[in-house]
């Protein structure tokens, strides 16, 4: 697990991702941090967050973009191998929080909103909840993600 979250010297005072630590911290290096979002409907939901404030992917240098995508792919591979989801959703929207971050979300045909987006209209209830249906402990999944990121 990474050290306690500390905003960087260039953190923007009005940026929630610069200033606040949300989610379960799994890994970080000098440029990126990874958390698991705490979402009862989507327990296998991770974010790759730029540690420095940058709004657009194209603002990164080529090696930084490659590193970011390497981290996204490492998480995606773990989710596919361990959970066999119906689909992995990848997104970097930034309309609400203009700080570069990628969402990596395991989706299943049984999840509450499938095939809609995670913010879409609920399609069904999930008996027992999504975590029970996931079939893997979050601690084990988080450990596998952190290990893959350490090797990425």
Regions found by a protein language model. Name each.
Residues 1-152:
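HIT superfamily nucleotide-processing domains
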């Amino acid at each position: 697990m990474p050290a306690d979250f500390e905003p960087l010297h260039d953190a923007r005072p009005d940026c929630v991702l610069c200033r606040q630590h949300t989610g379960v911290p799994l890994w970080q290096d000098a440029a990126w941090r990874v958390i698991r979002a705490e979402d009862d409907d989507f327990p296998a939901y991770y974010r790759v967050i730029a540690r420095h404030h940058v709004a657009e992917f194209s603002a990164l240098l080529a090696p930084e973009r490659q590193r970011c995508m390497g981290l996204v792919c490492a998480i995606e591979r773990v989710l596919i191998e361990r959970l066999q989801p119906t689909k992995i959703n990848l997104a970097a929207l930034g309309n609400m929080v203009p700080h570069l971050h990628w969402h990596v979300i395991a989706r299943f045909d049984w999840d509450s909103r499938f095939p809609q987006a995670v913010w879409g209209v609920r399609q069904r209830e999930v008996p027992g909840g999504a975590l029970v249906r996931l079939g893997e402990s979050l601690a084990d999944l988080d450990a596998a993600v952190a290990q893959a990121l350490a090797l990425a």
